[in-house]
Amino acid sequence: GLSVEINNTDAEGRLILADCLTYVGKYKPSHVIDMATLTGAVVIALGRHASGVMANDQNLANMIIESGEESGDRAWQLPLWDEHQSCTKTKYADLANIGGGREAGTIHAAAFLSKFTNDYKWAHIDIAATASYSTPVKAGTGRPVPLISELLLSKRLN
C-alpha cells in the first residue's frame, strides 16, 4: 500500500474513499464512480448548479456529463492534469492527504484519490455544492441520484 502524510485532519473523507477505491480493485471492476461531499472548494468553483466531475478516463467523464444533462442533474468536468499530481508529493510519505496552498482544492482532492485507481476506469463526483439546499430550508436534494439513475438505465457503461 501507499503511506500517507496527514497534513490536514479535516481532509479525512478522502482517506476513507482511498481505502474504498483500493478495496474495490480486488474485484477487477471495469468502472468505478465515487460520490462524496468532498470539498467546499467545488462550491466556489461551480456554485450550486452542478456537481464537479474528475476522471482518469475521458469517455467515462463524458458519459457522466451527458447523463447529467439528460436528467437535469448537471455535472461539469474539472481537469485532472498531470500538473495537478504534484500536489500529493511529500518527503515523509508516498503521498500527502492535501495539497499546499489554496488553489485547485477540488482537483487536488481528486488527484489524491486518483493514486488509488490505477487498475480501472474511475470518476469522482464532488457533490458538496449540490447535495443539499441551504435556503429556504436545510434539506437534502437527492442529487446525484437522477444523474446516476440515467447513467445506469441508459446502459452507457456497457
Q: Where do the model's predicted regions map?
A:
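A generic structural signal for tightly packed, nonpolar segments enriched in small/aliphatic residues
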Residues: 1-158
